[in-house]
């Protein structure tokens, strides 16, 4: 009952209060039990209004930021989404209620194993999980309608352009020299239209300038 109450409060005071108003997204956050994607020592902070670090480097995004990033994707029941930096599986579980198929990528081995276990325990069947370097993704010509990046980038994600369908969208947090903010990239031929969508920050997930994920073990 405690988690149920906290989850309801999170939806109302963190998501809806920050203008995440799509009822399908709110419904997904209401259904998915974040505590089930955390180790026992972290369950007590499951619905805190902050990022949750599951080990020294990997984290689950703050709920309202995750919700707003998702709300800026192309939300269609028959569309696909690539979930980059899915950590222990929470973001993929949220997306699984909104998209036909979720392709989930996590580079940290511990998080990947927890992710696999959690998705199985929750009986989520429309997520396909990969343990990959984020900057070297190869889906053998497959293209996606959407890409969600669960953290900050320090450069535009040109390495993803061939993975997007025409007019496909990427949402992420972008860090420039002075500020961090959420962005939406829309594929136009061989380039992106880049749109600043709201102020936000998170830990760095992909270090594009060093051509390797920020956190690799």
Predicted regions and their residues:
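Conserved SAM-binding loop and adjacent beta-strand
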Residues: 19-20, 35-42, 52-70, 74-75
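Generic structural signal for secondary-structure transition and capping sites
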Residues: 34-37, 124, 169, 202
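N-terminal auxiliary segments of SAM/dcSAM-dependent transferases
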Residues: 1-41
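Substrate-binding/catalytic lobe of Class I Rossmann-like enzymes that use SAM or dcSAM, i.e.
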Residues: 182-188, 194-217
């Amino acid at each position: 009952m405690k988690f149920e109450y906290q989850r309801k409060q999170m939806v109302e005071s963190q998501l809806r209060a920050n203008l995440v108003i799509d009822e399908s997204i709110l419904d997904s956050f209401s259904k998915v039990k974040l505590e089930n994607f955390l180790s026992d020592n972290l369950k007590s902070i499951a619905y805190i209004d902050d990022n949750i670090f599951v080990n020294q480097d990997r984290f689950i995004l703050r709920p309202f930021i995750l919700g707003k990033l998702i709300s800026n994707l192309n939300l269609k029941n028959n569309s696909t989404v690539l979930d980059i930096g899915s950590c222990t599986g929470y973001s993929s579980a949220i997306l699984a209620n909104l998209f036909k198929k979720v392709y989930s990528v996590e580079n940290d081995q511990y998080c990947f194993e927890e992710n696999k276990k959690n998705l199985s325990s929750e009986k989520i069947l429309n997520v396909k999980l990969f343990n990959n370097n984020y900057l070297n993704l190869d889906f053998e010509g497959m293209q996606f309608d959407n890409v969600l990046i669960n953290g900050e980038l320090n450069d535009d994600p040109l390495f993803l352009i061939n993975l997007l369908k025409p007019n496909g969208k990427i949402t992420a947090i972008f860090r420039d020299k002075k500020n961090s903010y959420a962005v939406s990239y829309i594929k136009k031929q061989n380039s992106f239209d880049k749109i600043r969508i709201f102020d936000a920050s998170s830990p760095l997930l992909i270090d594009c300038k060093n051509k390797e994920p920020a956190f690799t073990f």
